[in-house]
Amino acid sequence: MRNQQFAIRPTTLDQARVELQQIHFLDDTNLSFTTPSDLLRDFYDRSWPEYTTSSVVAQQLSNLMATPETDGLTYLTTHEQVPVDVFYNLALQRLGFAVDLDFQLTDPLAAMTKIQLPVADHEGTTFTLNELMNAWYVLLTTHNKTGQTFLDQLTTHGYFAPLIHDNSVPKPLIFNGKAQAVFDTTQLIHEVVYVESPQDTDHDGHRDLLKAEIIRPAETANGLKVPVLYTASPYNQGTNDEAGEALTHNVNVPLTAKQPAATTLADVTAESVTTPLPDARPVTATTHTAAETFAREQSYTLNDYFLARGFAVVYAAGIGTKDSDGLRTTGDPEETTSTIAIIEWLAGNRTAFTTRNATQAIPAWWSNHQVAMTGRSYLGTLATAAATTGVAGLKTVISEAAISNWYDYYRDGGLVVAPGGFPGEDADVLAEETFSRQLLAGDYHRIQEKWQHQLAAITQNQDRVTGNYNRFWDARNYLKNAKNIKADLLLVHGLNDWNVKPRNVNNLWRAVRDLPVTKKLILHQGQHIYINAFRSIDYTDIVNLWLTHELLGVDNHAETLLPNVIIQDNVTPETWQAYPDWDAPSNPVQHFNLQADELVAPSDHIPAAATSFNDQLPVDQFNHYTHHIDEWQADLLGDKHNAMFKHRLLFKSAVLTDDLVLDGRPTIDLQVAVNQPLGLLSFQLVDYGDAKRLGVSPTPLRIRLDEGYRWREDNLREFTVAATTPWKMITKGHRNLQNRTNAYQVDELKPNTFYDLSVTLQPTHYRLLAGHQLGLVIYATDFGMTVRGNQDLQYSIQLGQSALHVPFITD
């Protein structure tokens, strides 16, 4: 394994001593010790909280080897000094690394270097008392074999249990700039409130009430004010999976010609809708006691981790969900309004009630008015939407795999393009799936007619006929309001996420690059996933450092300690690199011209020529591919004379003599013609060369990774190397040939006439190894994403006028 820890805060010896005292590893007793071996023995005695007798603790120490010949108990009993190699022999074993398997007792420092574990500063071959204190401090921050810090490992064994009810222990308790698990998770308070939102989306003459589920530390009952992690999840109260499936659109339909129109941006700019708002409900009584509770929430494991560390957690599903008012809208300003209403209540700026009867108001009296939003996909999307309002109280957003513009989720370049894995899904399908008011028969009976009218409007306005950008999508483009962001941002995205494609995070990153907020970006090699339980990166520690700074006001240097950009390497397993930026404007660009079957240097002479392919497949082949998209993809990128040979164009570079690190948005300039007044092109950039590549889905390494003491659990995972493959798709893109100018203007397309076309592919960061070839595949129908009409469309490309441009960086 390889360990990368970005969140270890450099700490002076004086500060380390103070913090070790605060967590009870140092006290007046062991501070009086004069020999390093006695101090280390005492540290180890304290590190087995599950054993209460000294003889059993001694036995545990005797089970560790200090040298190839001597166990830990014997060594520390018979020696005064602690050699550096003895310290790390014992430490590696306590971290779960196996002698002879993971390291050799004759050279533990070699393993520390190989695994990339931190080694404490020391001047000689043995630790002084002060150096030993510092070394133990650093060890507590070091990751074990399962990706947890040693202190988190001790936490799961009950180290902090005696401190939970110790009034002398400060709460929150901070160690190495991070909050520690000194809160009683067996006594968490669960309560429900109904926040009154400034909207009436179901038009019943009353402001919408929104259900919020709150989990807060019991210590708040005694006056402690705590920060809040808020997850806005439209799935939280249940989903209508069968109804969504029934509404899913047929994608085996032909592409149709569009009427040319010189549509302008002003024509498609969404207009603010101002409708009279019902009066707020009168507040006649206020209480601090909730009237409703709940059992088990649909939790997010990262939130669970922080519940043990003194953060409150709030879940809300928003308008149009079970036990709330309103109608679903899929990402428009009304949904943003409902999202930030919860923040406004948590910040003390909005009213909530104890029940839906709205007779008693209840403030968030336990909140310190500092809120972070967390979540992946739709959840992270709403966090992004909330941030673009600049709402007071929202200090930071941790958004994973989030949409920044809904057009980029369901459309691309004037085409209906599905999120990967969900052909036929659209905004109306998602609205129906999340309209969980439908799960309550009585409530649905009262609202059904309004909902069906709303759903029909979404279906019409999303416009699957043209695929153009319009006012519907403009209202769902959060990038327009990125300038309003005041919250600091931690953005996380998968470079192989073809559900919420990388363009979403890239566009947001570029939009906030010059804003006066702290922003960080983590890009991993996965699909549409969470990364908070990965072994090779200290993501949970990063988030802890970040939230402790953002919500607790601790000056732990998170804003400068964490790199601007962290990117997982696609070649070497368990490797993450720090970068100053992603897709920087200053990146150099490598240019390739298109020649018959080749990508060549611009200096090469290219004779004028055209090459063609036909998109129409034999019926049996077409039908087979619609049910076996993986086989279509393999044939598309595979050997030259396979089943897709006449239905796509493939260009390969010469074999690379050096690694090429792609970084940013590849672009393609073409001259293209089609034999009908309609057409589309799709593109894939490909790494050709036999290699064992990382899988895009993580491998479970261990079940039940504890997040506290006798608390909830998560599954440890990691990207592992898969079997050898001959190619790997790097990135892709699509364009309607009638949207050559932009996504809203419809251009004329005359049959058999060549037109200039420039296409920007999805952004990437990818290391292409020496000995491999860069490939470009040009095709039309994308069986996983576009409509599939199987039409007789013949496409021609002018080779002498076509080129690929690839931004790159040098290591």
Swiss-Prot record:
UniProt protein name: Xaa-Pro dipeptidyl-peptidase
Active site, UniProt feature = S377 (charge relay system), D497 (charge relay system), H528 (charge relay system)
Q: What does this protein do?
A: Removes N-terminal dipeptides sequentially from polypeptides having unsubstituted N-termini provided that the penultimate residue is proline.
The catalytic activity of this protein is classed by the Enzyme Commission as: 3.4.14.11
Does the record bear Hydrolase in its keywords?
yes
User: Subunit notes for this chain?
Assistant: Homodimer.
Family stated for the protein in its record: Belongs to the peptidase S15 family.
Task: List where this protein forms a coiled coil.
Answer: none
* Superkingdom of origin: Bacteria
